[in-house]
Every structure is written in structure tokens, then in C-alpha cells.
């Protein structure tokens, strides 16, 4: 997701 490691 946008704020966690690009997941």
C-alpha cells in the first residue's frame, strides 16, 4: 500500500 514498503 502507499505507506508500507510499497505493498
From Swiss-Prot:
- Sites where Leucine amide occurs are at 7
Task: State the UniProt keywords alphabetically.
Answer: Amidation, Neuropeptide, Secreted
> Principal place where this protein is found?
secreted
* Superkingdom classification of source: Eukaryota
**GO CC annotations?**
extracellular region
Q: Any one Gene Ontology biological process term?
A: neuropeptide signaling pathway
The similarity annotation says: Belongs to the allatostatin family.
Supply the name of the protein.
Answer: Carcinustatin-4
The species is: Carcinus maenas (Common shore crab)
